[in-house]
Amino acid sequence: IASCLVGSEMCIRDREKNDVDGTVIALDGIAIIVNKASKVEDLTVDKLKQMFTGEITNWKDVGGDDGEIVLVGREAGSGTRDGFESIVDVKDSCKYAQELTATGAVISAVEANPLAIGYASLSAVGDTVKAVTVEGVECSEDTVKDGSYKIQRPFVFVTNKSVTLSEQAQAFVDFATSKDAADLIRTAGAVPVNE
């Protein structure tokens, strides 16, 4: 489809200087996950920043048992990693013990290690790990949609203002931003913004 791209938050920030329009079609909650045995129930964005940059290295400093924190994340280039690192303000400064190529691998690594912490898209998190609250707010479709859960990213259609979309491209954008697309967006693992 000519003149239509799908991106994330970066597109919104850059749209005015790049002469493009950004239309948010969905949101993705990025859940903070720990091993089910962890005593930690809630973390602040600031504590996450301190943990992922190596300033805090022991679980006892955030309410857990004594033990070295094992940071698990996605590989460089991952959209989930980019979203997490941008929101928590740890871009290029994380001290990962493991950088994995798939969300399922991150979840499995956290499940297998009682000292691990990682992040994953809300839709991928099941009952094998525990999603902690962030500043007292759980990661759920409702809290992502209402904005109270802080670690989330938008999925954005980006279109060039100086080019008229083709009929097919416009029809696709219209459908993707309609209530009719909500179930498809949810099935794909994101939170629809139009219902």
Outline where the language-model segments fall.
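Single conserved hydrophobic/aromatic residue that forms the stacking wall/gate
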Residues: I1-G7, C11-I12
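Ligand-binding "clamshell"
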Residues: R13-D28, G126-K145
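A conserved helix-loop-strand patch within extracytoplasmic ligand-binding domains
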Residues: K17-V70, Q170-V173, T177-A182
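Surface-exposed patches in mature extracellular/periplasmic domains of secreted proteins
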Residues: G22, W59-G64, Y96-L100, S121, ...
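A bilobed periplasmic-binding-protein/Venus flytrap-type ligand-binding module shared by bacterial periplasmic
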Residues: I30-S38, Q152-Q168
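Ligand-binding pocket segment of bilobal, Venus flytrap-like solute-binding proteins
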Residues: R74-C139
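Extracellular/periplasmic juxtamembrane helices and adjacent flexible linkers that interface
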Residues: T159-E195
